[in-house]
């Protein structure tokens, strides 16, 4: 089931959770979507600023599998 996250801080807390499995990064021309898969929900954060998206990509936890479909 999907859930939307509005704040970057909340997304990072969710990504650091023990049940977080992977992160998918989907890029469009307008925005970047970060989707983190946890045991119950798929949490989505939408960012329209490309620079913020790059910073967030670098601040993801190192143990998490990051998938970037082309």
From Swiss-Prot:
It is found in: Cytoplasm. Keywords: Acetylation, Cytoplasm, Isopeptide bond, Ribonucleoprotein, Ribosomal protein, Ubl conjugation. The keyword Cytoplasm applies. One of its GO terms (biological process) is protein-RNA complex assembly. One of its GO terms (cellular component) is cytosolic large ribosomal subunit. The gene is RPL38. Pfam families: Ribosomal_L38e. It comes from Macaca fascicularis (Crab-eating macaque). Coiled coil: none annotated. The modification N6-acetyllysine is found at residues 9, 67. GO terms for molecular function: structural constituent of ribosome. There is a cross-link at residues 4, 9 (Glycyl lysine isopeptide (Lys-Gly) (interchain with G-Cter in SUMO2)). Component of the large ribosomal subunit. The ribosome is a large ribonucleoprotein complex responsible for the synthesis of proteins in the cell. InterPro entries: Ribosomal_eL38 (IPR002675), Ribosomal_eL38_sf (IPR038464). Belongs to the eukaryotic ribosomal protein eL38 family. Component of the large ribosomal subunit. This is Large ribosomal subunit protein eL38.
């Amino acid at each position: 089931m999907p859930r939307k996250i509005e704040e970057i801080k909340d997304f990072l807390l969710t990504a650091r959770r023990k049940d977080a499995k992977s992160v998918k990064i989907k890029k469009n021309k307008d925005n970047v979507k970060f989707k983190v898969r946890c045991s119950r929900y798929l949490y989505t954060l939408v960012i329209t600023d490309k620079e913020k998206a790059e910073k967030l990509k670098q601040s993801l936890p190192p143990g998490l599998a990051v998938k970037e479909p082309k």
